[in-house]
Amino acid sequence: MQALEGVNTSPAAAAAAHAPAPRRGIAGLAVAAVGVVYGDIGTSPLYTLKEVFNGPHAVPVTPQNVYGILSLVFWALVLVVSAKYVLFITRADNRGEGGIMALTSLVLRAVPPGRKAWVLSALGVFGAALFYGDGMITPAISVLSAVEGLEVATPAFRPYVLPIALAVLCGLFVIQRHGTGSVGRIFGPVMLVWFVLLAVLGIAGITLHPEIIGALDPRWALRFFADMPLVGWLSLGAVVLAITGGEALYADMGHFGRRPIKFAWFLVVFPSLYLNYLGQGALILDHPDNVRNPFYLLVPDALVYPMVAMATLATIIASQAVISGAYSLTRQAMQLGYAPRMRTIFTSEREMGQIYVPSINWMLLGAVVALVVGFRSSSALASAYGIAVTLTMMIDTLLAFVVVRALWGWGRLQAGLFLGVFLAVDVAFFSATTVKILAGGWFPLLVGALIFTLLTTWKRGRELLNRRLRTDTIPLDTFIRSMFNSPSPRVDGTAVFLTTWLEGVPRALLHNLVHNKVLHHRVVLLTVETADVPHVPDSERVAVEELDYGFYRVRVNYGFKDDPDLPAALVRCADFGLKFAMMETSFFLGRETLVSRVGSGMPRWREKLFIVMFRNAGSAADYFHIPPNRVVELGTQVEL
């Protein structure tokens, strides 16, 4: 990952990036953010308190403990979500984009190349890899917890909970190829209704014991820890479920902007969530047996079935946001050189960001089905949930510390307080979730480790391959001079040769010359470069350099969220005097076959893994939207 150039990352720049918008615009974006950004954390009331008082480390049900847990939930939401993410980390944007990769890019601006930069970059990539494990668990636990409400209505539904949940999840993944553009616009209003229902149910519960509002006092949390230190620490492993999904608001910042996300949190999401937790707490105080499922027992009997339907819809929306996030993250990884090309389908002609990656979709579906069948209940799945999120939150805190210290110019004391407070909270939650590793927490860690290995192996393998190709490449200026001494026959048309290095002669060009004995009238050496910014403006899309003997060098620039459409980019070359007639243009692509060798620069197992990944990578023609009838592939064998 390269350091960003020309990006102002000061707080003032961040504020300018999110300048005041019309009130109606902010309101509309805030409603949309409620549907996409807060779906995950918005479904947490379905299972959080149930797990606190019923999980493997269940907290004894006493009034003092109920107050203590509710106080912990409140201050976790305040410190982690409100303070750390909404007020601080969202200010560290990459030209309006958020997410752990954007944060890593900002960090690398402030750190010179070396071991420290490598460690920070690896942390960022590992944090991104952990998202996939979380993306597998979120749909499973969310939908299961919603459908389990049927058991509250009548125990006769118990045998059908698992099949219904599996049917809902399979249906969700099967329809992904059709896109969500037509129904996506209702996500915000539906989730807004969901949060209103959470608040109304919570207020109804609070009327049973209005004094429950006193749980906002942090002394209840402190007293809870003082009276039962071990139980208090272990309870954090379940309390953390209340903040899972909080990290998503930073990742989705590019879609909505900082202000709408902040408004949605403080005006709708936070109040609704905590009112519902207070209502559940009051219900437990009224009847301790209600801990078996306090969310659904808060619902009037006549409304349980409609609420199950509404909760299922809310969890589907929450799952959709995670699934779409996995597609987006995969595409960014491809653009930044961390993942091989994969088939990507754009599901909307109007929204460039709406994509579908079949291989990721079916991988997620297989994992989600395995999780549901293997764990069989949301309570069992809760053991696997949280550890990846808390680890990601720790990584965010460490990277944000570098940003506030090196880029924002905070003093040691101010930055130290930032790191000390938030890291202490993150470590407390993470340490409590580590006791769940054997009970299921191993799953997201294993997935994260595997994805991290794949991402870093591809990145390292491509670096070694490009280095090898450059070593064996003839310098371009030498080759062009030789054309004057021994000119080759020319044919009409334009030949475009894709290359990773514009100073050398592509192997495909040499093979074409050796086998066909001709050169085209115009020879274009084209390289695609991806910057560590989300988007590159059209005015900076291409750079053209005319050389001797009909040769041209063309550099095409993209951001990591741009669609790499080469034919569209080449149209802009006309501004530089280089016009392309697509039916008179041939694209020559090299199809390398890799052969392993001793001393390649990677361990033997990793080298073999890279070769397998390289062999199964998607077609460059498909990835760059090159018309198939204009493509010529020339094979070559390369020792890695």
UniProtKB/Swiss-Prot annotation:
Subcellular location: Cell inner membrane
Membrane topology: Multi-pass membrane protein
Catalytic activity as recorded in UniProt: K(+)(in) + H(+)(in) = K(+)(out) + H(+)(out)
Gene Ontology molecular functions: potassium ion transmembrane transporter activity; symporter activity
UniProtKB keywords: Cell inner membrane, Cell membrane, Ion transport, Membrane, Potassium, Potassium transport, Symport, Transmembrane, Transmembrane helix, Transport
Segments traversing the membrane: 26-46, 69-89, 117-137, 155-175, 186-206, 224-244, 265-285, 297-317, 355-375, 384-404, 415-435, 437-457
Predominant localisation class: membrane
Annotated GO CC locations: plasma membrane
InterPro entries named in the record: K+_transporter, K_trans_C, K_trans_N, Kup
Function per UniProt: Transport of potassium into the cell. Likely operates as a K(+):H(+) symporter.
Record family assignment: Belongs to the HAK/KUP transporter (TC 2.A.72) family.
Entry protein name: Probable potassium transport system protein Kup
Organism of this sequence: Aromatoleum aromaticum (strain DSM 19018 / LMG 30748 / EbN1)
Source lineage: Bacteria, Pseudomonadati, Pseudomonadota, Betaproteobacteria, Rhodocyclales
